[in-house]
Structure formats: structure tokens, C-alpha cells
A protein has these predicted regions:
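A short glycine-rich, hydrophobically flanked beta-strand micro-motif that places a catalytic Asp/Glu
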Residues: 22, 93-105, 150, 249-254
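Generic secondary-structure signature for well-ordered alpha-helical cores
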Residues: 8-15, 37, 51-52, 88-92, ...
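Rossmann-like NAD(P)H-binding beta-loop-alpha module
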Residues: 1-45
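Generic preference for hydrophobic
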Residues: 21, 43-46, 110, 192, ...
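Peripheral (often C-terminal) accessory segments that flank ATP-dependent C-N-forming ligase machineries
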Residues: 139-258
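A short, glycine/Asx- and small/polar-enriched loop/turn
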Residues: 103-109, 208-211
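ATP-dependent carboxylate/phosphate-activation module, predominantly the ATP-grasp catalytic core
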Residues: 23-26, 34-92, 96, 103, ...
Length: 258
């Protein structure tokens, strides 16, 4: 019954009166990032994208990213050159590209891509690790027409493990945020970015969208074990309550998944 309703709804918006039905997938996910400089395309990072199924009837949303992905070598061997060839075939010269993909039986099944920076701000991690800032490159390109003079480009095999913890919140008015200074002082935390502050409202229409993201914390550590310890401490430190005293945070990432 749900399928029939969804099919009729989709058909009503189709000028061609055809509906594309995709296979529903629940596989693990990865995100990939490319930089295009004067027609040359370079893979700069590949990370695991972890999502949480914590709300009924909406798509799962990200709760963490981990770099580098254990799937990187396999991707470089089997798919990277084909992806670069595809980008070149459509004339991409300069810019930032991201790809989101499922990983099924060791193979990437791509479902989304964009020709821009991402809202996940992963460039903060790559900038810390390899010193090249994609945001600054785009600003420079906008002002001068040239992305960079740097001869050494980022290498996707990060020499340190890195993570982006993403906190999701329920709709409501934010009353109080605790733990910020404790998180800033943790070893390896390089930045944290709030999308809402105390007194602001997360609307009901945000449910099931990235508008539920309230905080991102960026961490670079010397070892994977140190990274996990810092991530756990971040989760323990942060508290966000509504004006009525309700805990607004949705279930967070479990570092045992790393």
C-alpha cells in the first residue's frame, strides 16, 4: 500500500510519466573528495560515513566521518581512474567535487555527488593534516582565476587518523548548551562548529534533513585508539537541553564501529 501511494505521488510530478525505482540499500557508506586544478583531477580524501537510523519514516542522517577509509586502496585500484576520466569527459577544469557512495561486497555504488564544498566541512581535517585548504583555493580562484601555485597536492592516505563527529538534535527551542570549553580543551580537537545557538529553534520541518545538525566536532589524533578516546570524551561532555529541560540530542555515534 505504501509503495502504491509513493508511486502515484512520484508519477504526478513526472512530465514524462515514468518513474525511476532504485534499489533500497542499507550498506556501509563512504565519502570521497576531489580537487580539480587546470583540468587535472586529484583524489584528496576518502572517509567512512556513519549514519544513524534513529527516526522513523525519514532517511538516516550522518553522525560521524572517519578518515582514511579502509576501502581506499581498493577504490584506487578499481574505480578512481574511471571517475577521473568521467570528470574530464565533461570538461571540469577547476573546483571541488564530492561523492557519496555505498560499499557493497567491497565495491562502491555511487548515489550522490556535487561540484562544491560540502556542509560537513571535512576540509578542516585535510587542511590540518596536509596543509592545503580547499576553501582558500576556491576563494583564490574566484579572485584570481587560479586555484593554487602549490606543486605538492594532497594525498588521500592520511598519515594520521581523523574524524568529524556530527550531533543531531530534536526539534525545539535550545535552552542551554554545556561542555563546549571542555571539548575545546581535549587533545586532538581542532575545531567545533555550531549551526544553532542557545535561544534558536530547530523547526519541525528540519526532521529528516541536515537542518537537524546542531554541532560538528573535528579531531585529528596520532593513533586510532587516541582518536576513539577523544571521540568518547566529546560524547560524554556535550549536553544540549531545550527551554523545557528536555535532552535534545539524538543517539550519537558508537566508536566501537570504527
Amino acid at each position: 500500500d505504501e509503495f502504491d501511494i509513493a508511486y502515484s505521488n512520484a508519477l504526478s510530478f513526472s512530465p514524462s510519466k515514468h518513474v525511476l525505482i532504485e534499489r533500497y540499500m542499507t550498506s556501509k557508506e563512504v565519502s570521497l573528495f576531489y580537487i580539480a586544478i587546470d583540468g587535472e583531477i586529484h583524489l584528496t580524501a576518502m572517509g567512512n560515513r556513519y549514519v544513524k537510523h534513529s527516526q522513523n519514516g525519514v532517511i538516516p542522517l550522518p553522525v560521524a566521518y572517519f578518515f582514511p577509509s579502509q576501502h581506499l586502496d581498493n577504490y584506487l585500484q578499481h574505480l578512481n581512474e574511471k571517475i577521473i576520466k568521467m570528470f574530464k569527459s565533461i570538461g571540469i577544469q577547476n573546483g571541488i567535487i564530492f561523492i557519496q557512495s555505498f560499499v557493497e561486497n567491497g565495491e562502491c555504488v555511487i548515489y550522490e555527488m556535487g561540484y562544491r564544498l560540502t556542509g560537513s566541512l571535512e576540509y578542516k581535517l585535510s587542511t590540518k593534516i596536509n596543509g592545503i585548504n580547499p576553501l582558500e583555493m576556491l576563494i583564490r580562484f574566484a579572485l584570481t582565476g587560479k586555484m593554487t601555485d602549490c606543486k605538492t597536492l594532497p594525498e588521500p592516505h592520511f598519515d594520521k587518523p581523523a574524524a568529524n563527529i556530527t550531533f543531531l538534535a530534536k526539534p525545539g527551542v535550545i535552552g542551554e548548551i554545556k561542555g563546549v570549553e571542555q571539548i575545546r580543551a581535549l587533545p586532538g580537537v581542532i575545531d567545533l562548529i555550531f549551526t544553532y545557538l542557545a535561544g534558536e529553534e530547530i523547526p519541525q520541518k528540519a526532521v529528516g534533513t541536515l537542518a537537524q545538525v546542531i554541532l560538528r566536532v573535528f579531531i585529528v589524533s596520532e593513533t586510532k585508539e587516541q582518536l576513539k578516546q577523544t571521540m568518547d570524551e566529546v560524547h560524554r561532555s556535550i549536553e544540549i537541553h531545550s527551554t523545557t529541560g528536555e535532552d535534545m540530542l539524538l543517539p550519537t555515534f558508537d566508536t566501537h564501529e570504527l
